[in-house]
């Protein structure tokens, strides 16, 4: 079993703090993307809304989440010991699982995969943000 990512908040306050900290970075990322696209200041004002910057912040937060990567057996062992309610997405008859738990919410999400680790991690992080953190941050 291994870990991908580094952020595993211990509390709702820690999650909110991290999310808020990504605000300025999200603004810079969006501004630089707009520049790279060759849009002028007028187009920036018209097209870049607070929702665009918020989406960038959501992605930055989600992509920083720590995710456990392991076999189905390792996941089932972990699941037997956790107090979290686990939401599992994906096919049941595969060899590997990625998961993220937020014990302070008593929730965890997991995604199964066979070969595409990178895709599974991305899917899981989006699921974790949507199912766990959206209401917290």
Predicted regions and their residues:
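Acidic, polar-rich N-terminal leader regions of halophilic archaeal proteins
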Residues: 1-137
